[in-house]
Amino acid sequence: MKYQYLLLGVLYGLLLSSCSLSAEEGDKEMDRYIANLMGKMTLHEKLGQLNLPSGGDLVTGNVNSAELTKMVRNQEIGGFFNVKGIRKIVDLQRIAIDSTRLGIPLLVGADVIHGYETIFPIPLALSCSWDTLAVERMARISAVEASADGICWTFSPMVDICRDSRWGRIAEGSGEDPYLGSLLAKAYVRGYQGNNMQGKNEILSCVKHFALYGASESGKDYNVVDMSRQRMYNEYLAPYKAAVEAGVGSVMSSFNLVDGIPATANKWLLTDLLRNEWGFCGLLVTDYNSIAEMSSHGVAPLKEASVRALQAGTDMDMVSCGFLNTLEESLKEGKVTEEQINAACRRVLEAKYKLGLFSDPYKYCDTLRVEKELYTTAHRAVAREIAAETFVLLKNEDHLLPLERKGKIALIGPMADARNNMCGMWSMTCTPSCHGTLLEGIRSAAGDKAEILYARGSNIYHDAELEKGGAGIRPLERGNELQLLDEALHTAARADVIVAALGECAEMSGESASRTELGIPDAQQDLLKALVKTGKPVVLLLFTGRPLVLNWEDANVHSILNVWFGGETGDAIADVLFGKVTPGGKLTTTFPRSVGQLPLYYNHLNTGRPDPDSHSFNRYSSNYLDMSNEPLYPFGYGL
């Protein structure tokens, strides 16, 4: 027996050695190929590889549409993003291969954040499943669908730790805990990239936003970040490092300052820490237009900002075209070196090589896959299953849930039949008309056993302009408020139980969606109070991309189920509402009692004067005059 174990050990050791040698030989082959290619490239062609414009199909910033076809022919781009549709992508790739001197293939990127056509729960919701396998499955299916439609690079995962729910992009991350965030970061990378990115279903992952973006002061997007190195290492950097350890192929720098220097041009962050300390050797890309935006920081105009970004370790310039248009002159002036340009170009080419684009430039251009692999029944079933794992039951007085499929159930609220808003933020690649509404899901599940009554009940906000800002690219039709409320109360009067579908609409969380008031929007609060006043039992289905302040709701509503934004939301909520599935979510982010408590998180360091009694004010203790220190719902909570 000992001999068998020894033999197995020797064989295993030889296998590992063989794999190591094979990987090393593969690296040498890549190095030879790229060195040979770069030996043929002009400076203009090298600078072109560093340029990443937006195609303008999908808007993620101020519209900055490049003339892509012209730029491809002129060898002025290394890739592009925000173009959806395999045939458009094939046409651009064909120009790059057939109509340029060296035929270098293009990277094609997209924000595939929580699904492509099949949409899964938003990342914050996914984290509440505490299920790394579920996250990996989501990323794997997203990669399959994106790659089938021509995409080879996703700007995901976002792993920014956030403890302040005023910040809208908390919806894109995994909550407040760095350990859980690290586990989920690795799961995302495994799901997107697979083992080696050589398969047709595997795409390049990009961890973002490096670094500390989730700690933006006052929860305001793009704002300043300032903290000690001790806090950085202990509380914020771990998920980025975990993604690097998992082999993530690219990293996106963040908009914010780190140590008073924009992350885009922060050499300590991008080179000393990321590359030298952590050993990252992949592609480093900026965020949208961030090199140009260094002028707004008061740091430098575009030309000097481009120099600083390159010197700091940036490889690819997203949208600003600073590298393309200014680095040649800066090279002549001695402000950058050819070695720095070559290093950046090499890493862009290495990413393409690792994706297999040099051996098969049309690897992601199989038009037959689109018909077979997007929004499939199997993918939707997985999304529906995972969604129920993310729902968090916050309250269930008298065991009101699950509901019986009998009698009359009133479904009331502006989120009940809002098809455009079911998928949540960062779902621009999907086709909203394909996704079912909550009303459709509940009626389907109830069948002929219960009558489902419906009324919209209210607008999102009383203020039309405020609602317009929150609705973003998914506007909701507004109605007469008195008529909406009257219809809702009439509907409620006929019902045995009321299900209120309320909360944020999809674009009220995500990028550029900071809030100072974190309650359910006012028009919906008024509706909810009127529904509770009827005396009928009320279930609140809470749609949100962030923790909200729910003191009144917790005190007055019978049951509260936080459903986030779940993709296959309608069917998944119906599964839980009628007891087919038990909600499995536990909070990964703290729900405050007041905005004044923020930032609020479970693992805060002790003070020298801890509060001995969190329920009443204690002078000379670390507490508030007017509010308990305790959150409404703590990290890890869920019934």
Describe the function of each predicted region:
Residues 1-26:
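Bacterial Sec-dependent N-terminal signal peptides
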Residues 19-639:
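Glycoside hydrolase catalytic-domain context in secreted enzymes
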